[in-house]
Amino acid sequence: MKLHNLRPAKGGEVKARKRVGRGYGSGLGHNAGRGRDGQNSRSGGGVRPGFEGGQMPLFRRLPKRGFKNHFAKQYAEINIRDLNCFEDGEEITPEILANAGFFKPAKAKDGVKILGDGEITKKLTIKANKFTKSAEEKITKAGGKVEVI
C-alpha cells in the first residue's frame, strides 16, 4: 500500500457545510429551512428554554423543595476497614490519608471523620477531626489509640 492508495475510512469523510439561503437552485433558498414567517424565522428569534407557549411551565407548576445549608460541615469520611492497609503501630494523620489517596483535600474542608463500618485488625494511632462511637470502640478494642485534633 502506498500513499496514493489511501482513502478516507467509510463514514469518516468530512461533509461540506450546508450553505442555506443562497438561491432556489441550491435547494435551500427562499426560507432557508426556517419554515414560513414567525418568531423562529427571525435572526435571534426563538423562545427561552422552558417556555410552553403561555401555558404555565412545568418548572413553575412544581413546588420548590428543600434548601442548601451553606454552613454544613464537609468532612472526608473514611471507614475503619480501609485502614487495615497500614502497618501495625503506625500513626495515621489526615495528611497521610490524603497522600495515600483516600480523599481529595478539596473535598475535606472541615477535616476527616472516621466511620465504624467493617473491622480493624491493626493497632493504629489515628488522628482525625471526628470519630463515630462505633469506630472509636473498635479502634480501642483492637489496641489502637484515638486522638481528636
UniProtKB/Swiss-Prot annotation:
Q: Which PROSITE patterns match?
A: RIBOSOMAL_L15
Q: Does the keyword DNA repair apply?
A: no
Which Gene Ontology cellular component terms are annotated?
Answer: cytosolic large ribosomal subunit
The cross-references to Pfam families, in alphabetical order and at most eight, read: Ribosomal_L27A
UniProt keywords, alphabetically? Ribonucleoprotein, Ribosomal protein, RNA-binding, rRNA-binding
Which N-terminal stretch is annotated as signal sequence? none
Known InterPro entries for this protein? Answer: Ribosomal_uL15, Ribosomal_uL15/eL18, Ribosomal_uL15/eL18_sf, Ribosomal_uL15_bac-type, Ribosomal_uL15_CS
Region labeled Disordered — which residues?
1-58
GO function terms (MF aspect): rRNA binding; structural constituent of ribosome
Q: Name one GO biological process term.
A: translation
Query: Which ranges are annotated Gly residues under compositional bias?
Result: 22-32, 43-53
Subunit field text: Part of the 50S ribosomal subunit.
What's this protein's family per the entry? Answer: Belongs to the universal ribosomal protein uL15 family.
Which HAMAP family has this protein been placed in? Ribosomal_uL15 (MF_01341)
Q: What biological function has been recorded for the protein in this entry? A: Binds to the 23S rRNA.
Protein known as: Large ribosomal subunit protein uL15
